[in-house]
Each structure stands twice: as structure tokens, then as C-alpha cells.
């Protein structure tokens, strides 16, 4: 079976329905039974008919099972041909090695069943009529054994289908901005303020609400903005290795990071702790990082209040930060101009 696969235009891993071994065998054997009835109704020498019937059953059963295995294999995109982000996503959620092994097992089964089809067709043609049924039963037994040997591999592919069907749809030609910052700093509010429509929500490992993707069209430039609640909003030291991999996978997407501070600290995290998170993200991502100080309207900053010097101490550490209030819609135009300035990073995804 040729291992020729395609990467679909909508960027999704469209794995077909995966049958169980019994479902696969039932379909093959039931179709073979219908074929046998058709052969039985034809006129031919009495001595030849039993052999033709049983040969047709073997060939049909093998062909039906092989066609299903080939269809599964052909419709799963070649992992190495996917953009790096999707390769990482599959590895984190399913396991690239497990998927490759499962697809390899389907190739193996296809080859063995092809050989069984040839061998038993020949045996039945050369056998006495009274032995044709016995040989067909032997063939069915061998076919069943092969299919049951790939039971775990079919389970892996079924698991992959369920885990990957809601994977994010990414436009790799768009300029991509990834939002970071502690919970409740105003990321969702900002996303809704600057994007054209309700953000798409898709599955992403270790996010609390799924990855959220918003889109903006600016001067014939498509910008997608990604928020990952539960991932880029806590200290890296608290993450395990798999969570770290999920975060690093975003490096394959980001043309820039939009890091949001809550200047009022009403999010529950002191500015110093927020600043530490920024420094950790700077160590992970090579993409440029743009800094916003949100909730400036309630930070007592503009009134030269008691928190002015405290907040200003952190603002002065940042080169060209934007001071905004996402809830009030203040600073949105400046943010959009900032996004206009982000240049797409050229990557070899294909």
C-alpha cells in the first residue's frame, strides 16, 4: 500500500472513522457473502461452481478490508509534511511515534492480507471442489488473525481522531500574535475589543478553556491573535515537561508576543510577580515581545496617587510600553497601530 497522504487545506487532521477489528471483519465477510450469492446464481459447470463461490468470497473479503485500511492510511496526512506547530501538537496530544507505528501496522496488515488473497485464491482454484469451503474457512481464520493483531493500532488511531478533530485552525500566512500574562489581567477583554468577530475556540493541551483565536484585517494584512488560558499565565517552574512542550509549540506560531500587565494588581498578582513571568517568557520565545499595562484607569496612576511611583517603577523598566484600559476601550487604536508594525517571521513549515 502506498503511503501517500495529503495535508488538507483547512489545516485539520481529518482522520476518518476508525473501525474495530470485528467491525472491519464483519464488513468484509458480509460483503463476501453477498458476492457468493451473486456467483451462485450464475450458470457454470457444477464442479467449478463451489470453487468459484469460495474464491470470490476470499477475494471480496480481502479487497473490502484492504480498501478500508488504505482509505485510513491515505486520509491521514503525512506528519512530516505538516507545519511544525501541528507536529508538536500531535506529539503532545497523541504521540507522533505511536501514530507512525499504528499507520505502519496498517501497512503491514495490508501487505499480509494481499498475500493471503493471492495464496488462497490459487489454492482454491487448484483444489478439489469438496475442499474449497475448508480452504476458504482457513483463509478467513488467517485474515481474522491479522486484523486482530492491529487491534491496538486501530485503538490508537481512534484515540487520535477524537483528540485531533478539534485542533486549532491556523492560518500560517497570517501575522500571528500570542497573548500572555497572568489570569484576569484583561486578555479576553482585549481580544474581544480588537478582533473583528467572536474568537474561535479550539482544543489545546493544558489550556483551561481551549485556545482562543481572533482575527483582524488591517490594511490588507491578516492578523490572528491567540490566547491560551491556563498556559502562558503562570510561572514556568510550575509546569511539567509536557506542559513546557505545549508552550514551546507556540514558538512555531508567534510573530510577536503581546504581554499584558495588570497595573492595578486586581488580578491578584503583584507587579513584581507579573514582571518575573515576563522575564521567563522572554527566555523561551525568540519572537519580539510587546508590552501593555492594562487597567490604568483604576491603578491610581493618572491621578498621581499613592501608587504612582510604585507603578511607574515597573513601567520605566519597559521600552515603549502602551498604557491602556481594555474595559474602557482606551488605547485600542494604539494597540492596532502596534500590531500593524509586527513583521511576519519566515518559517519553513512545508
Where are these regions (language model features)?
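N-terminal accessory targeting/assembly segments
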Residues: 1-109
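Canonical P-loop GTPase G-domain recognition
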Residues: 287-290, 297-350
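Pre-Walker A adenine-sensing motif
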Residues: 159-170
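Post-Walker A alpha-helix
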Residues: 190-191
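Conserved lysine of the Walker
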Residues: 187
Amino acid at each position: 500500500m502506498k503511503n501517500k497522504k495529503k495535508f488538507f487545506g483547512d489545516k485539520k487532521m481529518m482522520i476518518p472513522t476508525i473501525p474495530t477489528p470485528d467491525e472491519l471483519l464483519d464488513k468484509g465477510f458480509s460483503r463476501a457473502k453477498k458476492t457468493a450469492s451473486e456467483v451462485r446464481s450464475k450458470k457454470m459447470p457444477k464442479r467449478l461452481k463451489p470453487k468459484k463461490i469460495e474464491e470470490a468470497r476470499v477475494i471480496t473479503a480481502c479487497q473490502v478490508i484492504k480498501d478500508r485500511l488504505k482509505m485510513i492510511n491515505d486520509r491521514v496526512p503525512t506528519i512530516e509534511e505538516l507545519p511544525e506547530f501541528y507536529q508538536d501538537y500531535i506529539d503532545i496530544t497523541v504521540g507522533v511515534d505511536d501514530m507512525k507505528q499504528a499507520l505502519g501496522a496498517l501497512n503491514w496488515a495490508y501487505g499480509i492480507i494481499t498475500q493471503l488473497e493471492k495464496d488462497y485464491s490459487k489454492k482454491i482454484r487448484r483444489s478439489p471442489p469438496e475442499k474449497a469451503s475448508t480452504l476458504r474457512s482457513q483463509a478467513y481464520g488467517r485474515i481474522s488473525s491479522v486484523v486482530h493483531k492491529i487491534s491496538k493500532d486501530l485503538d490508537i488511531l481512534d484515540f487520535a481522531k477524537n483528540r485531533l478533530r478539534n485542533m486549532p485552525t491556523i492560518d500560517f500566512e497570517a501575522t500571528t500574535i500570542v497573548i500572555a500574562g497572568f489570569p484576569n489581567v484583561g486578555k479576553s477583554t482585549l481580544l474581544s475589543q480588537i478582533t473583528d468577530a467572536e474568537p474561535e475556540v479550539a482544543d489545546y493541551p493544558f489550556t483551561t478553556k481551549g485556545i482562543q483565536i481572533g482575527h483582524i484585517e488591517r490594511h490588507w494584512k491578516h492578523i490572528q491573535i491567540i490566547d491560551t488560558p491556563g498556559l502562558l499565565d503562570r510561572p514556568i517552574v510550575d509546569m511539567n515537561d509536557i506542559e513546557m512542550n505545549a508552550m514551546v509549540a507556540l514558538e512555531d506560531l508567534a510573530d510577536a508576543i503581546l504581554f499584558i500587565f495588570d497595573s492595578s494588581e486586581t488580578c491578584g498578582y503583584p507587579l513584581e510577580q507579573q514582571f518575573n513571568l515576563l522575564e521567563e517568557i522572554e527566555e523561551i520565545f525568540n519572537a519580539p515581545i510587546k508590552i501593555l499595562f492594562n487597567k490604568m484607569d483604576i491603578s491610581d496612576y493618572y491621578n498621581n496617587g499613592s501608587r504612582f511611583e510604585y507603578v511607574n517603577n515597573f513601567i520605566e523598566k519597559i521600552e515603549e510600553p502602551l498604557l491602556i484600559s481594555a474595559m474602557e476601550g482606551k488605547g485600542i487604536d494604539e494597540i492596532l497601530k502596534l500590531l500593524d508594525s509586527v513583521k511576519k517571521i519566515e518559517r519553513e513549515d512545508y
